[in-house]
Amino acid sequence: MKLDKSKELFDEAVNYLPGGVNSPVRAYKPYPFFAKSAKGSKIYDVDGNEYIDYCLGYGPLLFGHANEHIIEKSIEQLKLGTDYGVPSEKEVQLAKEVIKRVPCAQMVRFTNSGTEATMSAIRLARGITKRDKIIKFEGAYHGAHDAVLVKSGSGAAGLPDSPGIPTDTTKNTMLVEFNDEEALKKLINENKDEIACIIVEPVMGNIGCVPPKEGYLDFLREITLENGILLIIDEVITGFRISKGGAQEYYNVIPDLATFGKIVGGGFPIGAIAGKKEYMEQFTPSGKIYQAGTFSGNPMSINGGLAAFEVLDDNSYKQLHKSGEYFRNGIVDILDKLNINFHVNGVESMTQIYFTENEVYDYKTAQTSDTENFLKYFHLLLENGVFIAPSQYECGFISTSHSRDDLDKTLNAIEIALTKLYK
């Protein structure tokens, strides 16, 4: 595969951008390909190579790249202005669309990213409960703000996951393993009346794809209600992807607050917090808990979300369900054929293959994966025209633009890659 122009651009980029990229997840050795354009299920690089894309911008592109309806509506909005600094009618319209779909949503506050949404939701929970401590799950990613960038450590006090984060900032962030009821009960009992919220990815999408065990989200809802703790479901990835009402509809669990991003902007940068009216009204200016942003509710992102909801219907979810099921079954068949005991996890249009013989149900079991061979697998797929995230701990996504032919070509590439690695 020819990547001369990408190498040339990367060599230039490292002089102007830290590591040559604007987000570390995009970096892989020896250098990433540089995109030129994308359409539907395909992304094209500056060297003219075509890839079937399962990264999809890390989740926002439910319809694939450059959806015609969203483009048309975006051009219309572009001519009307890109930032007003005052409210617009479309903000109200998109809020109503979210409220119509999401079980917990009685009010919505739009932000500029999922990071802003989770940061503000945690601040809201702390302000409402007048408590400082929060619980997150090991391996869960809730954005790049200090309170949640915490690695595994003592359940009593989190340690910063990056230089530059004071220990005092994370001392109130406690960690527990996902899907472990007893560990969470113990942690809550040890910190009675001190915990403001539990924040959870209902399907953990940043250690690959780890769904909750049956009844686990119900358990979270029950134990938070019993202890006066707010439950925040982080739906930045799952929201409007695994069902019309997100994971809370899919698993029939209604949180106090939920955070969104990615799909709710139709491919434009956005975030959102949704929840019960009595809580949401505590945000300024109706309440005292501060939350703001220059580009919050900007016309381009709001318009993109409205355009996405105009084409998102029941048939979209039926197609995504069939494609996800077909794809996972195909991978399992290949593993059986090659006698490789790896595990495939997935929920609807989210999928990941784990390079381990262990069942993966939390952070520790995900870490048993062979990340070195996964990276080799990534490069072999790339050589065969398939683009997935380069990390074992990211999730793969299917869009409504992925055809059966795309899936079959991908399964063929997967078989070739695994055969080269293990046979």
From Swiss-Prot:
One Pfam family cited in the UniProt record for this chain: Aminotran_3
What is its subcellular localisation? Answer: Cytoplasm
Query: To which protein family does this belong?
Result: Belongs to the class-III pyridoxal-phosphate-dependent aminotransferase family. HemL subfamily.
A molecular function (GO) held by this record is: pyridoxal phosphate binding
- GO CC annotations on file: cytoplasm
Q: Which organism is it from?
A: Methanosphaera stadtmanae (strain ATCC 43021 / DSM 3091 / JCM 11832 / MCB-3)
For the protein in the UniProt heading, the enzyme class is isomerase
Q: What domain of life?
A: Archaea
N6-(pyridoxal phosphate)lysine PTM sites in chain numbering: 262
Q: Which UniProt keywords apply?
A: Cytoplasm, Isomerase, Porphyrin biosynthesis, Pyridoxal phosphate
Q: What is its EC number?
A: 5.4.3.8
According to its UniProt entry, the protein's GO biological process terms are: protoporphyrinogen IX biosynthetic process
Q: Which cofactor does it need?
A: pyridoxal 5'-phosphate
Q: Does the keyword NAD apply?
A: no
Which pathway?
Porphyrin-containing compound metabolism; protoporphyrin-IX biosynthesis; 5-aminolevulinate from L-glutamyl-tRNA(Glu): step 2/2
This one is known as: Glutamate-1-semialdehyde 2,1-aminomutase
For the keyword GTP-binding, the answer is no
Matching entries from InterPro entries are given as: 4pyrrol_synth_GluAld_NH2Trfase, Aminotrans_3, Aminotrans_3_PPA_site, PyrdxlP-dep_Trfase, PyrdxlP-dep_Trfase_major, PyrdxlP-dep_Trfase_small
Catalysed reactions, semicolon-separated: (S)-4-amino-5-oxopentanoate = 5-aminolevulinate
